[in-house]
Protein backbone atom coordinates (compact mmCIF):
# COMPACT_ATOMS: atom_id res chain seq x y z
CA UNK A 1 0.00 0.00 0.00
CA UNK A 2 2.87 2.35 0.84
CA UNK A 3 4.45 1.78 -2.61
CA UNK A 4 1.11 2.50 -4.28
CA UNK A 5 0.76 5.76 -2.35
CA UNK A 6 4.31 6.87 -3.24
CA UNK A 7 3.75 6.00 -6.91
CA UNK A 8 0.44 7.91 -6.94
CA UNK A 9 2.02 11.02 -5.37
CA UNK A 10 4.93 10.86 -7.87
CA UNK A 11 2.52 10.66 -10.82
CA UNK A 12 0.50 13.64 -9.54
CA UNK A 13 3.66 15.72 -9.07
CA UNK A 14 5.04 14.82 -12.52
CA UNK A 15 1.69 15.59 -14.16
CA UNK A 16 2.06 19.19 -12.94
CA UNK A 17 5.59 19.60 -14.30
CA UNK A 18 5.71 21.35 -17.70
CA UNK A 19 6.91 19.16 -20.56
CA UNK A 20 9.82 21.50 -21.25
CA UNK A 21 11.30 20.69 -17.83
CA UNK A 22 10.93 16.99 -18.48
CA UNK A 23 12.78 17.50 -21.79
CA UNK A 24 15.96 18.31 -19.84
CA UNK A 25 15.45 22.04 -20.31
CA UNK A 26 15.95 21.66 -24.06
CA UNK A 27 13.87 22.37 -27.12
CA UNK A 28 10.75 20.20 -26.91
CA UNK A 29 9.04 19.22 -30.18
CA UNK A 30 5.28 19.85 -30.07
CA UNK A 31 2.83 17.70 -32.06
CA UNK A 32 -0.92 17.35 -32.44
CA UNK A 33 -3.41 20.22 -32.52
CA UNK A 34 -0.91 22.76 -31.15
CA UNK A 35 1.41 21.95 -34.10
CA UNK A 36 -1.41 22.02 -36.65
CA UNK A 37 -2.69 25.37 -35.39
CA UNK A 38 0.77 26.99 -35.31
CA UNK A 39 2.02 26.19 -38.82
CA UNK A 40 0.89 28.80 -41.37
CA UNK A 41 -0.15 27.71 -44.86
CA UNK A 42 1.81 30.59 -46.44
CA UNK A 43 4.80 32.68 -45.39
CA UNK A 44 5.53 36.27 -46.49
CA UNK A 45 9.03 37.15 -47.79
CA UNK A 46 10.07 40.09 -49.97
CA UNK A 47 6.49 40.81 -51.03
CA UNK A 48 5.74 37.18 -51.89
CA UNK A 49 3.26 34.85 -50.23
CA UNK A 50 5.09 31.51 -50.38
CA UNK A 51 3.42 28.19 -49.46
CA UNK A 52 4.87 26.31 -46.49
CA UNK A 53 5.58 22.59 -46.33
CA UNK A 54 3.72 21.41 -43.23
CA UNK A 55 5.27 17.93 -43.55
CA UNK A 56 8.71 19.56 -43.27
CA UNK A 57 7.90 21.88 -40.37
CA UNK A 58 8.47 21.68 -36.63
CA UNK A 59 7.00 23.54 -33.66
CA UNK A 60 9.18 23.58 -30.55
CA UNK A 61 8.89 24.97 -27.05
CA UNK A 62 12.11 26.64 -25.93
CA UNK A 63 13.54 26.00 -22.46
CA UNK A 64 11.70 29.16 -21.33
CA UNK A 65 8.39 27.84 -22.75
CA UNK A 66 8.07 30.16 -25.76
CA UNK A 67 7.30 28.75 -29.20
CA UNK A 68 9.50 28.66 -32.30
CA UNK A 69 8.43 27.35 -35.70
CA UNK A 70 10.96 26.05 -38.22
CA UNK A 71 9.69 25.03 -41.64
CA UNK A 72 10.57 24.60 -45.27
CA UNK A 73 8.79 26.66 -47.93
CA UNK A 74 7.91 25.82 -51.54
CA UNK A 75 9.53 28.38 -53.83
CA UNK A 76 8.59 26.51 -57.04
CA UNK A 77 7.25 29.01 -59.56
CA UNK A 78 8.88 32.05 -57.94
CA UNK A 79 11.75 34.08 -59.39
CA UNK A 80 15.17 32.46 -59.50
CA UNK A 81 16.34 35.04 -56.93
CA UNK A 82 13.73 33.79 -54.42
CA UNK A 83 14.38 30.12 -55.26
CA UNK A 84 18.14 30.47 -54.80
CA UNK A 85 17.91 32.54 -51.63
CA UNK A 86 15.19 30.87 -49.53
CA UNK A 87 14.65 27.34 -48.33
CA UNK A 88 12.65 27.89 -45.17
CA UNK A 89 11.17 30.06 -42.45
CA UNK A 90 11.53 30.73 -38.75
CA UNK A 91 8.80 32.26 -36.58
CA UNK A 92 9.90 33.00 -33.02
CA UNK A 93 8.20 34.31 -29.89
CA UNK A 94 11.51 34.68 -28.05
CA UNK A 95 15.21 35.30 -28.51
CA UNK A 96 17.27 32.17 -29.04
CA UNK A 97 20.67 31.19 -30.39
CA UNK A 98 21.10 29.33 -33.67
CA UNK A 99 24.71 28.13 -34.11
CA UNK A 100 25.97 30.98 -32.00
CA UNK A 101 23.92 33.69 -33.73
CA UNK A 102 21.18 35.51 -31.81
CA UNK A 103 17.78 35.23 -33.47
CA UNK A 104 15.20 37.65 -32.09
CA UNK A 105 11.44 37.71 -31.84
CA UNK A 106 9.84 37.80 -35.27
CA UNK A 107 9.68 35.96 -38.56
CA UNK A 108 12.62 35.23 -40.81
CA UNK A 109 13.52 33.42 -44.00
CA UNK A 110 16.55 31.18 -44.31
CA UNK A 111 18.60 29.66 -47.07
CA UNK A 112 21.72 27.54 -47.20
CA UNK A 113 24.55 26.39 -49.39
CA UNK A 114 24.21 22.84 -50.66
CA UNK A 115 27.46 20.88 -50.33
CA UNK A 116 27.83 17.81 -52.56
CA UNK A 117 26.03 14.80 -51.09
CA UNK A 118 29.26 12.85 -50.63
CA UNK A 119 31.16 15.84 -49.24
CA UNK A 120 31.88 16.38 -45.55
CA UNK A 121 31.92 20.17 -46.04
CA UNK A 122 30.03 22.38 -43.61
CA UNK A 123 26.70 23.77 -44.76
CA UNK A 124 26.34 27.54 -44.50
CA UNK A 125 22.99 28.80 -43.19
CA UNK A 126 21.90 32.38 -43.90
CA UNK A 127 19.08 34.08 -41.97
CA UNK A 128 17.16 36.96 -43.61
CA UNK A 129 14.54 39.43 -42.41
CA UNK A 130 11.26 39.60 -44.32
CA UNK A 131 12.59 42.36 -46.57
CA UNK A 132 15.48 40.10 -47.66
CA UNK A 133 18.37 41.68 -45.71
CA UNK A 134 20.87 39.14 -44.36
CA UNK A 135 20.89 39.15 -40.55
CA UNK A 136 23.19 36.24 -39.74
CA UNK A 137 25.29 33.47 -41.24
CA UNK A 138 26.64 30.35 -39.58
CA UNK A 139 27.91 26.86 -40.37
CA UNK A 140 26.61 23.40 -39.57
CA UNK A 141 28.64 20.20 -39.48
CA UNK A 142 27.61 17.06 -41.33
CA UNK A 143 26.42 14.33 -38.95
CA UNK A 144 27.05 11.04 -40.76
CA UNK A 145 25.83 9.09 -37.73
CA UNK A 146 22.26 10.37 -38.14
CA UNK A 147 20.16 7.25 -38.74
CA UNK A 148 17.12 8.76 -40.48
CA UNK A 149 17.81 12.20 -41.91
CA UNK A 150 14.82 14.20 -43.08
CA UNK A 151 14.72 17.57 -44.84
CA UNK A 152 14.15 19.41 -41.53
CA UNK A 153 13.98 18.19 -37.94
CA UNK A 154 14.81 19.34 -34.41
CA UNK A 155 16.31 16.94 -31.89
CA UNK A 156 19.03 16.81 -29.25
CA UNK A 157 19.30 20.61 -29.14
CA UNK A 158 20.01 20.89 -32.85
CA UNK A 159 18.21 22.00 -36.01
CA UNK A 160 18.96 19.45 -38.72
CA UNK A 161 18.71 20.23 -42.41
CA UNK A 162 19.26 16.81 -43.91
CA UNK A 163 22.44 15.55 -42.22
CA UNK A 164 23.77 18.99 -41.28
CA UNK A 165 23.33 20.09 -37.65
CA UNK A 166 23.02 23.63 -36.27
CA UNK A 167 23.15 24.14 -32.48
CA UNK A 168 20.08 25.60 -30.75
CA UNK A 169 20.20 27.37 -27.38
Predicted regions and their residues:
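Positively charged n-region of N-terminal signal peptides that target proteins for export
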Residues: 1-4
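Bacterial N-terminal signal peptides
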Residues: 8-16
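General structural signal for secondary-structure boundaries
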Residues: 13, 27-31, 105
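Generic secondary-structure boundary signal with a strong preference for alpha-helix termini
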Residues: 14, 111-112, 143-145
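Residue-level recognition of conserved structural "scaffold" positions that shape functional pockets
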Residues: 17-18, 107
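Residue-level signature of transmembrane alpha-helix interfaces in integral membrane proteins
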Residues: 18-19, 116
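Primarily secretory-pathway and cell-envelope proteins
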Residues: 21-81, 96, 130-169
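Mid-length scaffold segments of soluble, non-membrane domains
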Residues: 75-128
Amino acid sequence: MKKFLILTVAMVVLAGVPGSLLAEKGFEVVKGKAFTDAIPTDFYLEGNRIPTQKRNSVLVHTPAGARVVFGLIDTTGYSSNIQQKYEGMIISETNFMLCGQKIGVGSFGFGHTKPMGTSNEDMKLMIYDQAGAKLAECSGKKDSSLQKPSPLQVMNGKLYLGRHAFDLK
